[in-house]
Amino acid sequence: VAVLKTDMLVAETDVPRGMSLWQSARKAVVMNVSDFAAKGVQPKSVLVSLGLPRNLMGVDFEELAKGLNAGAREYGAYVIGGDTGEACDLIISIQLYGAANKKGLMLRSGAKAGDILAVTGFFGKSAAGLRLLLDEAYKTSVALRDVLVDAVLMPKARLKEGLALQRSGAVTASTDSSDGLAWCLHELASQSGVGFLVDGLPVADEVRRFAEVNMVDPCDLALYGGEEYELVVTVDPQMWSEAEDAVEGMGGRLVPIGKATRKKKVILDVDGIR
């Protein structure tokens, strides 16, 4: 079957202070590739529609083009065309194309009670990095700031991991975390007709350090930040080793954070407190 995806980046809402045009264009591609990763589909081609403000110069357009091409090639796709027009704000609309075996697609609707809930990384860095970019009152070391801000400016889609998980046949449901970990857990639960008990919230160590210094809740940063582009999957417990090996074979890590339950609620257990 043909697999199509479109998503739009608007500068006013999606491009924080400090993000270059090159990074903005690349991010627009990553946003779309992440959804392909969650389905286990290799993107092949990219169409781009650009809304360009009058104040952009020729060199700016060149930076956008380079960023789009870099993002596409990073994930094995090609920019094959598109359109441009004048707009009041920078708008980058991406249309991503690929093909897949319909039976092999990883959907959001297949989780079963007892399945292992897992993610491909730790959360909160984008939320913390965004706070650093938007508010100089937040404190951190130079090294930690670089890590957190890089999560915002150079996000990464987990395409290799998604393709490997699809090949493993171990995944029962899958989504990406671009809208925030909390939202995608509720979405998976709703689509699959299950609940989740999350007893291993995957908060990044860097986020815990940032939160301690700035007296903010690291759990909030991990749950509600968004734009992290990790995969959130449920795995048949009898095939856990296959799923784990598949991701590790791509240089990644599959982190168990809980399990699917019959109760249609998402419950967070932090140090025994629910």
Where are these regions (language model features)?
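Helix-biased detector of long, well-ordered alpha-helical tracts
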Residues: V1-R274
